[in-house]
């Protein structure tokens, strides 16, 4: 069984690719992507997989059945735009 999950995350500032332990929380993945892609840290973001928002963000990747290589979207929410 794989202990790592490779994520390819589409963001407003390009694609983020990174590998995380399967026990990494969604909120920690979001923080890493926001920092790497130089997105506004104060904005609220969600990770979306096949149209489904990955919530609650305290859950680990593995709890959503994410294994191997996975494509996600990072979507800004409630940024007051």
Question: Model-found features: residue ranges?
Answer:
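Ubiquitin system architectures
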Residues: 1-81
């Amino acid at each position: 069984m794989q202990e790592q999950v490779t994520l390819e995350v589409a963001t407003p500032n390009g694609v983020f690719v990174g590998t995380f332990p399967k026990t990494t929380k969604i909120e920690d993945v979001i923080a890493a992507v926001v920092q790497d892609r130089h997105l506004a840290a104060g904005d609220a973001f969600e990770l979306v997989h096949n149209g489904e928002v990955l919530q609650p963000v305290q859950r680990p990747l593995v709890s959503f059945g994410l294994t191997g290589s996975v494509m996600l979207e990072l979507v800004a929410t409630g940024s007051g735009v």
